[in-house]
Amino acid sequence: TPLPTATDYVAEDENLQELPAAVEVSEHLFGGMPCQLGWCNGHNTRLNCLEYHRDSEFNLGTEDFILLLAKLDEVENGRLDTARVKAFRVPAGVLVEVYATTLHYAPCHTDAVKGFRVLVALPKGTNTEMPAGFQSGGGDDEKLWACNKWLLAHPDSAEAAQGAHIGPIGENIDISLDNAQ
């Protein structure tokens, strides 16, 4: 898969779906439910947003990467103090389960030269366009950005400029600043 200079995400990659392991992922990680294998690749050091799904997500990186995570139950009135976000380093080749109650978003690289390449396994249809004519019913619907994707955007993010729900308050964490100290 490509390694862009920014971050790119493909919800479902046909080449990955055709691998024999795709059936095993569906059977063993999702209990036989249809799933999609996609990827998130590139270079990133910032939080920008947090998202959650109503199902677990599985990630597997070809290089070490960092996930910026928080707990969904720490969101109060649609807001989350970014001081509650914690960084977790994931070793290359280690499969991690990001629970439905875990706020997360794009991985961060540990090496700017290598970037990150992360396989993303989710229930089929996740992170795809909302059905035509979807009407928000208020509440959590205000955060619904795509199918099975509730998004909290930092005010400094591109997603906030596109109209995403503003959720994280405080610093838009940049792990490259931590590495410089």
Residue ranges and their predicted role:
Residues T1-A92, Y105-Q181:
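Active-site region of the double-stranded beta-helix
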Residues V98:
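Aromatic-residue-lined binding/catalytic grooves and analogous aromatic/hydrophobic interfacial grooves
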